[in-house]
């Protein structure tokens, strides 16, 4: 059986308020639970007008309170910018409020420009090379298993209850897969960012996995942009707004999701068209028949049975319909 989950970046459409965007996130999470989705995760992005999810832990609390069974999590917390102890306590707090429903996905991404990173850490310069140590510390705190010789031995990440959040690592290749495997935690491959290295990353994860207090067996999924419409032609039209938005993001432009009309009128250069063609490798677009076959091909290639999808189209109604069609295909 294929499981479906959602990664919500809370993309803001042009002409829409972030307030409305976040209200849409609540509605979509409630609907996705009804449709049978397994998880609903929020991304973390800073100093941008185009994405409204800056604090996934707050969105998790909101969504978990408005739903009943779907797992809710982060995709992911920018661990290099924070204290592992604080992150662990925040997610233990959420787990105490919503037992067996909380996922802690963490990433190594610096989180933006150098200035943004310094603002996040209040001027303290942190190194990405500390990520392995930070990840291990989060794992220790979540499982209350700090070694006796650890500098923080005796410290407890509260509240202490009988369950703990699931711990996942987000990554784009072999190093992150190996890191997750060696620590016995879940692995999320970002196909929607880098579609080239997934097969090898999943193979390394499976072959190198060491059972842990988090997972006894390898647990992996991949994230991908998906637009599922009635026909291939309709899906292609819906994708125009996402194409232009990704093009602008790739150029470092802080952009909200444009309308289809704006995308059609945009003066694309030959270089733009080539970039859009490359970006299409990061997504699956088409009718239900087209989408189902392509996603099944990917799950077979990656040898996983869970897909986490994003759909950053302009129109919210079209977005809902895409997610519902996906559910009808697999759930």
UniProtKB/Swiss-Prot annotation:
A Pfam family of this chain: Bac_luciferase
GO cellular component, one term: cytosol
MF terms in GO: oxidoreductase activity, acting on paired donors, with incorporation or reduction of molecular oxygen
Gene3D superfamilies given in the database record: Luciferase-like domain
Family annotation (InterPro entries): Bact_Lucif_Oxidored, CmoO-like, Luciferase-like_dom, Luciferase-like_sf
Domain of life of the organism encoding this protein: Bacteria
Family statement: To bacterial alkanal monooxygenase alpha and beta chains.
Protein name, as recorded: Uncharacterized protein YceB
Species assigned in the record: Bacillus subtilis (strain 168)
Gene: yceB
